[in-house]
Amino acid sequence: MTSQLEKEAREWIEETLHTKLNAQLDLLDQLQSGVILCRICKEALGANIRYKESNMPFVQMENISAFINYAQQVVHVPSQDMFQTSDLFERRNDEQVLRSIHSFSRYAAKMFPGKVRGLGPKLAEKKPRVFSAQQQREFREGVNSLQYGSFDMPTQGTEKIAFSRRRDPTGNMY
């Protein structure tokens, strides 16, 4: 499963940046500096995101953190869909990183249509059902409790169910 996610993520990144990534290296090793992720935001989505190419660990973690902040605050990717900096930098949870890239692509495609394509299923849109007072009244009048029963939740008292005999604290049984 992870190899399929990685393949799709690699293709999406290459398509988005119009650049080929090194096929000999692992995708997550190439993303570890955070530069490629920030370039996606800056070049493809036009973000004003600052990043620096460096081999210093704290700079790389800042780049990753900048991507995560942009994804959550601007693209509105839910926090449960995003990875944490240590998941990528320390390679703690590779699958979560790949799933986050997929999720980021979907939310970015929704927010910036035509700039990037989304990976995986299309995001659903809320379509709340609004009923008029007349429709609600017709529904209430049309329900026959003899046919459908009661809409109240059953309880032990209403269903006359006893899971044990009643006990007296002195030990007597009823």
Swiss-Prot record:
| Keywords for the protein's UniProt record, in alphabetical order | Cytoplasm
One GO biological-process annotation of the entry reads: mitotic cytokinesis
Q: Which InterPro entries match?
A: Calponin-like, CH_dom, CH_dom_sf, SM22_calponin
> Which is an annotated GO molecular function term of this record?
actin filament binding
Read off the Pfam families from this record.
Answer: CH
Q: Which GO terms describe its cellular component?
A: actin cortical patch; cell division site; cell tip; cytosol; nucleus
Where in or outside the cell it occurs: the entry states: Cytoplasm
Name it: Transgelin
Question: What organism is listed for this UniProt entry?
Answer: Schizosaccharomyces pombe (strain 972 / ATCC 24843) (Fission yeast)
Q: What is the lineage of its organism?
A: Eukaryota, Fungi, Dikarya, Ascomycota, Taphrinomycotina
